[in-house]
Amino acid sequence: MITARDYQGRVNGIFGQPKLIVDGMNGPNTSAGISQAMAKMGVRRKEDLFNRGVRGVVWHWTAGANGLIELEKKAYNFLHDTKGNTYDGNATVAEQVMYDWRRGIGASHTKSMNTGWIGLSVDAMAGAKQTNPITWGSHPITWSGIDAMLEQTANLHHEYVFPISPWTTLSHAEVQPTLGVKQRWKWDYTVLPGDTKSRDPVEVGNIPRERLTERFL
């Protein structure tokens, strides 16, 4: 089921601005925004604002060391090592659209926001802590790993035609402030390689979105 929150985020992504408050309430403003987005995209059914049910992409890091383990492959649809290689997770995009944790369908990568959301993760940040300055641990994120994640996002964007925006391509740390879905103190990504302290997640998320657009689209 596509939720009101999904529609609100998609409308904002299509228009590239916060046209609707993402609050999960399907009121007159949301209905009007959906109608305007349908007109802009040339579709007759509101469900067709989503290509094959894909809502968007959430960017993560695994908090893992070098080398993929089964738990990580189960948790994400795609993984990327710090050298820039990309690996398939256990769940396909089609399975993610049909997400059902009770039946073991899809990856559970984001609390209360998995159906149709594709989880991409850099396999890194073992031992990292959100201290000031940052404790980077034994296996920090790299731009090579992030770029692999962004390139895969671009590939998915071309296939499933979702907007590149703060509402549809965002980090785990942006989910709560941007889409209002409560998370458990997630800080991926509030830092990028070379940072010494955490920053606002949306400010940080704008950097890979801009990098994605400039380098991979």
Segments and roles (model prediction):
Residues 12, 64, 176:
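Alpha-helical and His/Cys-centered functional microenvironments
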